Each structure stands twice: as C-alpha cells, then as structure tokens.
Amino acid sequence: MASSSSSSYRFQSGSYPLSSSPSLGNFVERIKDACHFLVSAVLGTIISAILTFFFALVGTLLGALTGALIGQETESGFIRGAAIGAISGAVFSIEVFESSLDLWKSDESGFGCFLYLIDVIVSLLSGRLVRERIGPAMLSAVQSQMGAVDTAFDDHTSLFDTGGSKGLTGDLVEKIPKMTITGNNNTDASENTDSCSVCLQDFQLGETVRSLPHCHHMFHLPCIDNWLLRHGSCPMCRRDI
C-alpha cells in the first residue's frame, strides 16, 4: 500500500513539469520576441539618427560654402551668406532625407526606392541639390536687405557702403554706358556665363545691361539703377562711380 502511494506521489509530482513546460516555453519565446523588437527599434533609431546627422552635416558644409561664395558677390556679405547657406542647406538636406525615408517605407518597389536614394546622395554630395536651394534663399536675403537699406538710407549711413558716397541723380545714372549682351561679352575669364550680382540671374543674349565705368562690372538696368540712386559706388567692388 505504501509502495502504491509512493508511486502515485512520484507520478503526480513528475507531472507538474510536463504541464508547465509549454507555458514556460511560450513565456521565453515572448521574451525573445520582445527583445528582438526592442533591439530592432533601437538599431533603427540609431541608424536613422546617424543618417540624419550625415545629411545635415553635408548640407550644412555645402550650404555654407555655396552661401559664402554667393554672399561674397552680392550685398549679403561673406559671413551672412555662409550663415544663410548653412541653415538652408541643413534644413533642405533633412527634408530630402525624410522624404526619402517616407518613400522607402511606402508601397513602392524596394529597388526603385534604392535607386532614388542613391541619386539623392550623389546629388547631395555633388552640391547640386544644395545649390538649387541656396540660390533662391540668397536672392530673397539680398532683396530683403536692399529693401531695408532703401527705407533707412535717408536717416542712416548704409552699413555696407564703405566708400561713403551718396546716390547719383537720375540724369547721371542714365549717362552710364549701356551695352547689349552678345556671344562675345557673355562670359568671364573662366568661360563661365556672366550674371548680375544683384539678382543672381544669368545675362541672356540680346539683353541690355549697364556697364559701370572704371571697373566695367555689368548689371541688369533695373537692378543697378535702383542701387545707384541710393549709392554712388559699384555694389561688387565698392569703387566710386
């Protein structure tokens, strides 16, 4: 009788691990799945942050360089141009990255998204995307600055006028030589197409421009005429007219 009870006890006690094994296994699998999901989410966040930083850094550097070069040739100035370019380049690069990420997560084909992302990266590194964004931003800054100078010039000396000369009269402005853009005078020494440093637009064949005396810098008539009515110097080299 005792032997029977002992056997029954051993059987019952041995049955508990058998009944609890499936529950324990499911619990372990859930823990593994949760850990796998957590690790994937963390890695995805880290990779996204690294790529965002990369795009922002490249955009900032290229934007600052492009903005500085444009600002040096306009009224924005080297430092202000670099600052505007850096901010615009960083913001635009992050926008491009986020758009690429949204496209990657969409229902579009993975291969097409991959080619698009490669094209974006190449265009970003070459500076094309940043230049396309910086140009309008710098033009807006130049126009805003010229408008501000126009309203304050009667009471204050322009911060950008190092020559100290006042604006010319309308009659004097009209006496400054005009010329028509042709294939012979539309390029600089580096064979690049000349452009107006006020509005940043390239000169087109057949356009009438004004060539300043002494320095011979050329500008669109509306751009330079408005400038000369407020300043008596070249907006590029500051040489007095």
From Swiss-Prot:
Keywords from the UniProt entry: Chloroplast, Membrane, Metal-binding, Plastid, Thylakoid, Transmembrane, Transmembrane helix, Zinc, Zinc-finger
Region span, Disordered: 1-20
Keyword Transmembrane helix: yes
Residue intervals annotated with topology Stromal: 58-76, 131-241
Listed transmembrane segments: 37-57, 77-97, 110-130
GO cellular component: chloroplast thylakoid membrane
Family annotation (PANTHER family): NEP1-INTERACTING PROTEIN 2, NEP1-INTERACTING PROTEIN-LIKE 2
Family listed: Belongs to the RING-type zinc finger family. NIP subfamily.
Quaternary data: Interacts with RPOT2.
Name of protein: NEP1-interacting protein 2
